């Protein structure tokens, strides 16, 4: 495995691979890799001749009071895991390399409309603008045939799918299912902020999603307000501060006033456990 730190070299390496007729898969990450990231890497490894992992904590997608400065980082461990999982190139640019203007200023962004109005986008203004801008930069640098994103960040995945479609990018976006602990807790780099007791309690997040699924698919509840109310009360009783619990249309990410089959629905929530913000979702099809 080769570690690449600058854009020029990364482009040259990929261009050489493509001249040899090789396909390239990109796994964009913010580092501090866990089994969820490794599932993305392993999927990319099976489907491409060359695998590139980017390891970059992107300041553009953090709000002023969020955890950019303390976001967990362990570059040596990330490099070891990437090497063990057959990664060909680990791209680790600095902030100055990605945003070279004075003060890391960015004057041109890729913007998002409508798709960021609900779920996390409603509570993290500017977040998805930062995400799609850096992903566009990575796509331009690496020119992958395929790029891999986890379904745990479902709004991010859907926005990137639409971006690629709307901007005619010749890249296949490959969704990879959420990886969970045995308790059901979705793997996340931010889980490292949790104590052992909090980690145990956090398993209730997934239980709330399963509860919503059961209410809709098994009990036939058609009122989304009823589903949301039941699940929000459950989470509150478990000690969470619920930022949102929403049911949205898979394609448009618009809030659903009621269940009307056939529908593909994202059941999603964001909660605080102490100061730690955790998200999770489940995708269901109502026939």
UniProtKB/Swiss-Prot annotation:
Keyword Nucleus in record: no
EC category: ligase
Gene Ontology biological-process annotations: pantothenate biosynthetic process
Binding positions ((R)-pantoate): 61, 156
Catalysis: reaction(s): (R)-pantoate + beta-alanine + ATP = (R)-pantothenate + AMP + diphosphate + H(+)
Any one cellular-component term (Gene Ontology): cytosol
Binding site for beta-alanine: 61
Cellular localization per UniProt: Cytoplasm
Any one GO molecular-function label of the UniProt entry: ATP binding
Active site per UniProt: 37 (proton donor)
Primary location class: cytoplasm
Associated pathway: Cofactor biosynthesis; (R)-pantothenate biosynthesis; (R)-pantothenate from (R)-pantoate and beta-alanine: step 1/1
Annotated EC: 6.3.2.1
Keywords: ATP-binding, Cytoplasm, Ligase, Nucleotide-binding, Pantothenate biosynthesis
Coiled coil region boundaries: none
Keyword Transferase: no
Chain sites annotated for binding ATP: 30-37, 150-153, 179, 187-190
Additional note from the record: The reaction proceeds by a bi uni uni bi ping pong mechanism.
Listed NCBIfam families: cyt_tran_rel, panC
Function description: Catalyzes the condensation of pantoate with beta-alanine in an ATP-dependent reaction via a pantoyl-adenylate intermediate.
Similarity annotation: Belongs to the pantothenate synthetase family.
Subunit and interaction comment: Homodimer.
PANTHER family per record: CYTIDYLATE KINASE/PANTOATE-BETA-ALANINE LIGASE (PTHR21299), PANTOATE--BETA-ALANINE LIGASE (PTHR21299:SF1)
Name of the molecule in the record: Pantothenate synthetase
Species this chain originates from: Coprothermobacter proteolyticus (strain ATCC 35245 / DSM 5265 / OCM 4 / BT)
Designated gene of the protein: panC
């Amino acid at each position: 495995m080769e570690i690449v730190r600058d854009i020029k070299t990364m482009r040259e390496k990929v261009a050489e691979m493509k001249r040899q007729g090789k396909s390239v898969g990109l796994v964009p990450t913010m580092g501090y890799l866990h089994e969820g990231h490794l599932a993305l890497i392993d999927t990319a490894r099976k489907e491409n001749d060359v695998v590139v992992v980017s390891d970059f904590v992107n300041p553009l997608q953090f709000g002023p009071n969020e955890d950019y400065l303390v976001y967990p980082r362990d570059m040596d461990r990330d490099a070891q895991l990437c090497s063990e999982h057959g990664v060909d190139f680990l791209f680790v640019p600095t902030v100055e390399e990605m945003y070279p203007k004075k003060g890391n200023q960015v004057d041109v962004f890729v913007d998002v409309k409508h798709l960021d109005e609900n779920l996390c986008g409603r509570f993290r203004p500017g977040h998805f603008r930062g995400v799609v801008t850096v992903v566009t930069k990575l796509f331009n640098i690496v020119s992958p045939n395929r790029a891999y994103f986890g379904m745990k960040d479902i709004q991010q995945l859907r926005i990137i799918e639409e971006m690629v479609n709307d901007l005619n990018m010749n890249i296949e976006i490959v969704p990879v299912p959420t990886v969970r602990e045995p308790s059901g807790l979705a793997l996340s780099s931010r889980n490292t902020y949790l104590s052992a007791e909090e980690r145990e309690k956090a398993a209730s997040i997934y239980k709330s999603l399963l509860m919503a699924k059961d209410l809709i698919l098994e009990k036939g509840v058609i009122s989304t307000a009823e589903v949301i109310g039941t699940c929000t009360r459950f989470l509150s009783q478990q000690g969470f501060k619920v930022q949102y619990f929403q049911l949205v249309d898979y394609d448009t990410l618009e809030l659903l006033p009621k269940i009307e089959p056939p529908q593909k629905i994202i059941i999603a929530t964001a909660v605080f456990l102490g100061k730690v913000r955790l998200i999770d979702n489940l995708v269901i099809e109502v026939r």
